[in-house]
Amino acid sequence: MTDAELKKLKDDLWHSADILRSGAHIAANKYGQPILGLIFLRYADILFKQHKDDIDKEYNSKKGGRNERPYKEICVEKCGFYLPECAYFDFINDSPDTAAKADLVKKAMQAIEDENPRLYGVLPKEVYGQLVPEEEPELLSRVVRIFKDIPENIEIDLFGEIYEFFLGEFALSEGKDGGTFYTPATVVRYMVEVIKPEAGEKKFLDPACGSGGMFVQAARYMHRHNQDADRMQFRCYGVEKEPDTVKLAKMNLLLNNVRGDITEANSFYSDPYDAVGVFDYVMANPPFNVDEVLYDRVKDDKRFNEYGMTKGTKGKGKDAKETVSNANYLWISYFATALNEKGRAALVMANSASDAGSNDLIIRQNMIKAGIIKQMVTLPSNMFTSVTLPATLWFFDKNKPEKQKNEILFIDARNIFTQIDRAHRKFSDEQIKNLGIITRLYDGDTKAFDELIEEYRTKAVRENKEYFESQINWLLERFPEHKYQDVIGLCKVTEIGEVLDDERNVKEILEDSIADQDWSLNAGRYVGVVIEDDGMTEEEFKEHMKSSYIEYEKLSDTAKDLETAIAKNLKELFGD
């Protein structure tokens, strides 16, 4: 299926959401559940059909012999699950009884769960009764017919893309609430591009996993880099406190053939995976600025206190308990402590955390001195449905090269985005690659840079010459030597900046270092600002502004004189 055909299929399927919005007796923020459930049902149906000939052949070849095997056992081996006949999509779609359609869908999902214990409680069985309103009993049948149009020869991996497309559209339609379960795919893809997860016997944690998008994008990265043979050894561990979102995540992993566990729990108070020093990768987009976390329940937890403990705030009233007024640094500490000695992490965090003071500053200072923070990236505003302000990406690496131990790479990406609509932005594929190559160059991987330039040259010949030549120019203007260099307004490697004496006491702080900037991790403090139109230096810009202000004052005085003269002339002309 070509990209154009897939886009058309997604758009056609999205029509099902329009149908539900217009006629279903269901809250606006709930119609995603039945549609995502039908996507899974159609996925299971097509996947089973694609394996059924092999399943039947295996079963019939051994039937009646000493090696005879149960039919369901062969199904699980070849397909991953057994699909009972009542769950066949044709059986549901072809039923003439439109009023009973909801019951058929419910029974199909219940049968799938009964036959496949790992799916127990995952499918949204109970919502379909609301999709057969008395005034339009054929509503659900219309939606089912739309999903029947998915071709049965579709590449099964495309179901994951379809599911992700719907998650993204539902998140956009729900606005702020949508951001609680979905992180925009292009942001996640960039995060994955930086930490470069490797297949094999690796463990991957997301303690605020939402619908599981971090896991899915990591798996797709491995697929793009030809690591499918080892991908099934890669295991994901997610924690999510919202029951409905847990179901979304479990379906997402199944649709994308990702092995993992999703646990319903509150990560502040529960540690279902004993997550201290054991994970190869941690990625997450946790909720920002959470308050009212009970201080006594987290202050002695190793996940949160290795680098210092964020401050508790005493509540008001006789029985009030001490709480953490802002849990951002609980999350940040959690990600750092969950990593093993070679682990890497990427997380989305509120911009304010980069400069937070008090105990949070101490935690940040200790992390910086420990040499585990590799990179900080300021994102553009309007990249998320839940917040309009820019967020920051933190990248940890417990196994940084020795030459990087005393420095951090800062990237200011606030001006790198593609506008979706008035209120939303994203990264294009090329923007993800261009930002990712900065990290590759910082790591000394000049080969990756050359390969990207060559990729763009090939696409300039085959596809859009002007567009891909502009991408080449963007890279070569900033990195003309095909190696990393600081670029004003974009990226800068900054030293931690503490010079110690023989007794490990601080004897000097380097100018413009991180220590000199009060341990701030705000990229804007370091990368500087370039005036693209005139190329002026900061000093030249200040001088230009000074002379412009003097000119402004002169013009203002002239304007006042003219205003007085005009008023006088009008008065003489027309009288009082």
Report the location of each language-model feature.
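Non-catalytic, mostly N-terminal accessory regions of nucleic-acid modification and defense proteins
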Residues: 1-202, 261-270, 378-381, 405-412, ...
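Conserved Class I SAM-dependent methyltransferase catalytic core
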Residues: 29-43, 191, 246, 250, ...
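Short acidic (Asp/Glu) and glycine-rich catalytic loops that position anionic groups and cofactors
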Residues: 141, 259-263, 302-305, 344-349, ...
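Conserved S-adenosyl-L-methionine
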Residues: 177-284, 288-301, 349-352, 356-364, ...
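Conserved catalytic motifs of ABC-family nucleotide-binding domains
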Residues: 288-291, 295, 299-325
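C-terminal, active-site-flanking charged/polar segments
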Residues: 369-373, 383-447
